[in-house]
Amino acid sequence: MKNKLLQGTVVLLCSSVVLRCLGFVYQILVVRISGTESLGILNMTMPFYMLLVVIATMGMPIAITKLTAQYVASHGQYVIGQMMRTAFLLVLALSFVCLLAACIIMPKAFSLLHTDIRVSQCFVVLIPGIVIVPFCSVMRGYFQGMQQMLYPSVGQIVEQLIRVFCGIALLLWVSPKDVLSMAMSLGAAAMLGEAGGCVFLAVMYLHSRRKAIAQQPNQSVAGRIQWMKPLLSLGIPVTATRLTSTVDMAIEASIVPFCLIVSGYTLNEAAAIYGQFSGVAMSLLTIPTVLTGALGTALIPAISEVAANGRKKELQQYCGRAVSVTWAFSLPIIFMLYLYGEEFGQMLFHIEGLGEMMRWLSFGAVFVYLGQTVVGILQGL
């Protein structure tokens, strides 16, 4: 069991390092090519997109990870196949509802919450992700529950590579004076990356379950309804938690630019400042999540299996070590960002005035890192 947790954490950590490096280099290139205004427009759109994705996903990755880890040893692949079919049908129905909301409700919401019309225009290119991401998340949850961390890790790397290459290519292709086109190009690149990662995971999923799928009979309606209860009982609390944070992000994305405009900044200046905050400062601040995110994800199936077998002493050891590693890794990076935030902004992104923002943000950063580890423990339980 310890080897599985260690192996899963190492795979996810290596993947997270690669993803973080690719994402960080991408952010640097985006800021240098397009500036922070286009990044600000996209990041004002993303919370509303994520709100719909969270609802469409309905916590299925965590639910599937936990149920797969619990049932695969005792019930076999047949039961897991029934659960996966139900999960796919559930996210399909939820994605359809969220697509309708994106087309009918969101335009009115943007007109009420944002004075910058470019935000609603940029949102259009993100709509395909409302269907792609939930299906991708279901397959990722299956592999994590089987403690096969390699496939979802490679899938995320494929997604990021496509996003980086397409994003840079589109930015160089559009006019540098057209800020909206650059923002939409970044959104389109993200959707192409999501699609590529989803195709990879689908191929790996069908390959890993080809024998079970061929031998599995058609599932009855009663069987699908029977699986709804455990999936939703685990998924709804996770969704409620994520909705809280996503709604908070959406409110922030609306209030911060509005307050900047009230303070005397123009629409363009407000978008640029918000891009500096969300795209530059937060990129630096999330560096420790390379470890804490990987650790939190790997803890879910490991904690779930230990808790199901009643091994309380081993459970306490896992929790204590995870929190200790989080503290040891996060604190030095927080101090570096507090002291040298301005220097990092000038050296990497060629922007000034980042130091004061980084000093304020670093005070609350430790709770973000610790929260990822603790959430992984609680979701495993």
Question: What function would you assign to each model-found segment?
Answer:
Residues 30-51, 179, 183-184, 227-234, ...:
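Interfacial/gating helices of multi-pass transporter permease domains
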Residues 62-107, 134, 316-330:
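Membrane-water interface segments that mark the loop-to-transmembrane alpha-helix transition
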Residues 97-115, 120, 332-350:
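Short membrane-interface helical motifs at transmembrane helix boundaries
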Residues 154-179, 337:
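Alpha-helical transmembrane segments of multi-pass membrane transporters
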Residues 169-174, 192-220:
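C-terminal transmembrane helix end/exit motif
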Residues 1-22, 78, 82, 219-245, ...:
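N-terminal membrane topogenesis motif
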Residues 58-73, 285-310, 319, 323:
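Helix-loop junctions and terminal segments of transmembrane helices
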